[in-house]
Amino acid sequence: MQVSVETTQGLGRRVTITIAADSIETAVKSELVNVAKKVRIDGFRKGKVPMNVVAQRYGASVRQDVLGELMSRNFIDAIIKEKINPAGAPNYVPGEYKQGEDFTYSVEFEVYPEVELKGLETIEVEKPVVEVTDADVDGMLDTLRKQQANWKDKDGAVDAEDRVTIDFSGSVDGEEFEGGKASDFVLAMGQGRMIPGFEEGIKGHKAGEEFTIDVTFPEEYHAENLKGKAAKFVINLKKVEERELPELTEEFIKRFGVEDGSVAGLRAEVRKNMERELNGAVRNRVKSQAIDGLVKANEIDVPAALIDSEIDVLRRQAAQRFGGNQQQALELPRELFEEQAKRRVVVGLLLGEVIRTHELKADDERVKGLIEEMASAYEDPSEVVQFYGSNKELMDNMRNVALEEQAVEAVLAKAKVSEKATSFNELMNQQA
């Protein structure tokens, strides 16, 4: 076997391989012997068919199969010998084959980039320092009560957290536009569902009033014909409602799994959940900054084959989220996923190099801790832990999570890490 390697462009490589004629003939004869042992041909007993008959009937197909097998096997031998690491599926380009002569073919593919980590000392990470205060717990209890609240009619003016039922009709330059009209539209104030100025224009009015508000559509609005346009909305305010918050009764508290039904028990449970969310948010914030810094400090070429593969993964995930099938996933435009796919490939390559250079392996205690932390959010944590322990795929996924955390910690060990005091709400809003 003769081998030559050339760079086509960037990460592209072409390996040209020549297989000696006698190697091909030896392999063909060997395979024909195997075929002769198995085939049945009228007039001959099984295994007693003359080789010339077998060769005449099966020689062409056997030769083709043997060539395919030799091309694959010799390519693998070549890249092992040349210490080449292909990324993605190779493209075989066979040359002209003539029986009795050497056979030359080429294989085109991309290789993984050579990654040499640098600039880790320049990465800056700001670690949030947060504690869950009594006021934070009070705020979460208020949120829980609001989620369970009943709505009752209100005689007064619309306030920031009320709910209104309205008819509205919008126009630009005196002309109504598509989607600008609705009847009996229920709007919970303060959730940012409408364009800027819409809710503000309703506040202070009472049920039964009809009025006009002036707003301007944002420049980034999805409808091209409305971007940046001034509009008028005629509003008929039909109903105003306010929340009627439930009291923290024993019955109410038990809905949240607090068996003794006490306020103290509920506060303890809420605090525990908030601290779990907080720990995850701090980890994610630090990890995000570390990875951003790692990517910024290390520009690398990315094999197109890996990006294409990642785009397919993102397409399937998107289709699953929206109830689509495999075919619909493939029809989604690649432009929707290309940037995210490239980012994921780059991050994977860089963290992979961190893992390799630091000889990291998933720490069993960390894996156990991650599973227990995740399971604590469920009603029966021990059942969840047991389920993970009996599922190889889930355990492998959790080991990958642990290994990624360890890689991020290796980056942080060399980065410039500072601390910044912040509040629970500020941090959680950054995560949203």
Swiss-Prot record:
Originating organism = Enterobacter sp. (strain 638)
- Where does the record place it? Cytoplasm
GO molecular function, one example?
Answer: protein folding chaperone
Q: Which family does it belong to?
A: Belongs to the FKBP-type PPIase family. Tig subfamily.
Q: What does this protein do?
A: Involved in protein export. Acts as a chaperone by maintaining the newly synthesized protein in an open conformation. Functions as a peptidyl-prolyl cis-trans isomerase.
The cross-references to HAMAP family, in alphabetical order and at most eight, read:
Trigger_factor_Tig
Q: What is its main location?
A: cytoplasm
The record's section on Pfam families has: FKBP_C (PF00254), Trigger_C (PF05698), Trigger_N (PF05697)
Q: Which InterPro entries match?
A: PPIase_dom_sf (IPR046357), PPIase_FKBP_dom (IPR001179), Trig_fac (IPR005215), Trigger_fac_C (IPR008880), Trigger_fac_C_sf (IPR037041), Trigger_fac_ribosome-bd_bac (IPR008881), Trigger_fac_ribosome-bd_sf (IPR036611), Trigger_fact/SurA_dom_sf (IPR027304)
UniProt remark on domains: Consists of 3 domains; the N-terminus binds the ribosome, the middle domain has PPIase activity, while the C-terminus has intrinsic chaperone activity on its own.
Gene name, Swiss-Prot/TrEMBL: tig
Catalytic activity line of the entry? [protein]-peptidylproline (omega=180) = [protein]-peptidylproline (omega=0)
Name under which the protein is recorded:
Trigger factor
- Gene Ontology annotations of biological process type: 'de novo' cotranslational protein folding; cell division; chaperone-mediated protein folding; protein transport; protein unfolding
Q: Which domain of life is it from?
A: Bacteria
> Cellular component GO terms, alphabetically?
cytoplasm
Report the EC code(s) recorded for this entry: 5.2.1.8
Kindly indicate whether the keyword Cytoplasm belongs to this entry. yes
Which keywords has UniProt assigned to this entry?
A: Cell cycle, Cell division, Chaperone, Cytoplasm, Isomerase, Rotamase
Boundaries of each PPIase FKBP-type domain copy?
A: 161-246
S-adenosyl-L-methionine among keywords: no
